[in-house]
């Protein structure tokens, strides 16, 4: 008798499952298809992104090779193309390299491209500071100290990645302008910063020694 009841129970369960399947099978299948499509789509996206990155890397290397061969105009054009079409990581590197290629034959043109990067709010703070410093390095011998100060002061703040170089450039610019007060300010800041690289600290100390003594009040 128990076996008969078991068979009846099993039949009831099968009938209930059949009803549930008949009622909800279309939803179950749809969910399964959506999961498969989502997984497939994500893997497809990952594949395409990896493919784009690999292509951009190869194109970047090819442009760098042109630069090594002193084909700067061709290299600049190649980096410009990458800056417009490559994934975001390579895009910024390409913009910086395009500016460097322009600077190799026209420093003012290179500085202008670096200034565009520095003014681009979509660019990270470190990249902006790097662009400011590279532009300033190109213009150090021709630009005024007030202009250099306006250009570089944001990069000199405590904790800024490139603050040491920015401070040294400002010290040199002030020195060139015979502004000993400003030169001393930046040299003192370089020497007093415990994280200043030793070679730069030595240069700053050498320049400090050449400054006239501070007048006693």
Description of each model-found segment:
Residues 23-26, 36-46, 216:
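Short, low-structural-confidence N-terminal segments
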Residues 86-217:
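Soluble extracytoplasmic domains of inner/organellar membrane proteins
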Residues 53, 58-93:
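Short extracytoplasmic
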Residues 1-4, 66, 191:
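Membrane-proximal soluble domains of inner-membrane proteins
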């Amino acid at each position: 008798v128990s076996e008969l009841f078991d068979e009846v129970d099993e039949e009831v369960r099968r009938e209930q499952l059949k009803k549930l399947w008949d009622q909800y099978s279309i939803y179950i299948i749809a969910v399964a298809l959506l999961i498969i499509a989502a997984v497939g789509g994500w893997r497809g996206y990952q594949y395409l992104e990896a493919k784009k990155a690999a292509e951009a890397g190869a194109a970047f290397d090819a442009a760098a090779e042109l630069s090594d061969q002193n084909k700067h105009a061709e290299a600049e054009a190649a980096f410009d193309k990458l800056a417009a079409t490559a994934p975001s990581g390579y895009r910024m590197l390409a913009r910086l390299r395009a500016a460097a290629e322009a600077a190799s034959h026209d420093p003012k043109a290179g500085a202008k491209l670096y200034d565009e990067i520095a003014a681009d709010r979509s660019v990270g703070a470190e990249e902006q500071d790097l662009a400011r410093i590279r532009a300033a390095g190109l213009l150090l011998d021709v630009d005024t100290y007030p202009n250099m100060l306006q250009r570089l002061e944001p990069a000199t703040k405590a904790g800024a990645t490139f603050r040491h170089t920015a401070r040294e450039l400002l010290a040199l610019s002030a020195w060139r302008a015979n502004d000993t007060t400003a030169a001393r300010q930046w040299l003192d800041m370089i020497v007093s910063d415990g994280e200043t690289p030793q070679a730069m600290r030595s240069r700053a100390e050498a320049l400090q020694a050449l400054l006239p003594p501070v007048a006693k009040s």
